[in-house]
């Protein structure tokens, strides 16, 4: 029977491997990362990744779920918060801001999230269809449901949704070296993300008011 100390050490090792895997996948993508590199980054024996997770594929899916698995549900539920014009605008702003959290990182977990998102979008893995279904579609539908409150025509609704999606996705598609080119010199990343969010939302609100 395992002692409490052994169980505790096992959990710590598992978490260290997950943290190392997140950094490795965010930096190198699925194909570029290796279990050996992940174990080296975690400072543990090279065999432990297989012991705790089985395969690199299983580890990648778990890391992706940790980053993106909890994102879709709250965004999909935003439409349920809307009771009037003010709450609709607040919900749309929350959606845009949360999406930019993934694609325009400032530090820490945001950078890892954005790195993984970038690699998966620009170099899709064999899990891409699964991720798109489980993580991407709920996020997209969350935006679409909000816009459907203002746009009745299906073609126009899809145009609005895909247009906003494209604006917030561009940072995921661009290499991080290009991010500075989009941002005025001297403006911090988080401040710029807030300005981008304001710009997109203000444009949407103004155009909706004219419609």
Regions found by a protein language model. Name each.
Residues 1-12:
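N-terminal intrinsically disordered/low-complexity leader segments
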Residues 11-19, 52-76, 80, 129-133:
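An amphipathic alpha-helix adjacent to DNA-recognition modules
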Residues 16, 24-58, 62-66:
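Helix-turn-helix
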Residues 88-105, 193-211:
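N-terminal hydrophobic signal/anchor transmembrane helix of membrane proteins
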Residues 73-82, 101-141, 185-191:
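Short secondary-structure transition hinges
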């Amino acid at each position: 029977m395992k002692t409490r100390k052994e169980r505790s050490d096992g959990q710590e090792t598992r978490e260290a491997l997950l943290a190392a895997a997140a950094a490795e996948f965010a930096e190198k993508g699925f194909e570029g990362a290796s279990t050996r590199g992940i174990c080296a980054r975690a400072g543990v024996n090279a065999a432990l990744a297989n012991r705790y997770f089985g395969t690199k594929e299983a580890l990648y899916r778990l890391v992706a779920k940790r980053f993106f698995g909890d994102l879709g549900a709250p965004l999909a539920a935003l439409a349920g918060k809307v009771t009037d014009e003010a709450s609709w605008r607040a919900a749309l702003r929350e959606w845009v801001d949360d999406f930019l959290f993934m694609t325009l990182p400032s530090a820490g977990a945001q950078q890892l999230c954005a790195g993984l998102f970038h690699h998966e979008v620009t170099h899709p893995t064999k899990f891409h269809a699964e991720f798109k279904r489980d993580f991407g579609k709920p996020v997209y539908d969350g935006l679409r449901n909000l816009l459907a409150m203002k746009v009745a025509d299906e073609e126009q609704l899809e145009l609005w949704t895909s247009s906003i999606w494209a604006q917030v996705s561009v940072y995921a598609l661009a290499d991080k070296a290009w991010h500075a080119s989009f941002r005025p010199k001297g403006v911090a990343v988080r401040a710029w993300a807030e300005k981008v969010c304001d710009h997109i939302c203000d444009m949407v609100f103004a155009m909706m008011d004219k419609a």
